[in-house]
Amino acid sequence: DTNYKCLLWIDTLNDKPDIVSEIVGIEPSRKQIKGAHMGGKKPPEAIWKINTWEFVSPTRYAQNLWLLQESFEDVLNMMDRREKEFIAIAKKYDNINFQLQSTTYLTPVSFKLDTDVLYKLKKYHGYVCFSIWTWIN
């Protein structure tokens, strides 16, 4: 089985990622802080260039495209429960990204999301990108 998940990440520019948690009342799955050291590398490569607040959908073991859609819906449903707060974040930073991650190179980049999901992405000024999932939380 291929392991799929949706990662929501918000670039908080020069603010610490904790500000998102304070506004939306949800702790991130992970946060990256500008200037944080990446083990084993020497500066300047060791420095993150952006601050990010990241939330990962529950893992899906998908054998069909429908489960990929569900991973987006997991994240969007979480956001909808705090809609006003996430819209405020979207306006503040204008950089909310939804990243579909896959453990294999079979990620269908032409995958089409349902209209209602696309509408919700638009509401949050969201962008969708695809990548290979190379780490385990």
Annotate each language-model stretch with its function.
Residues 1-137:
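Acidic (Asp/Glu-rich) sequence patches and key acidic residues
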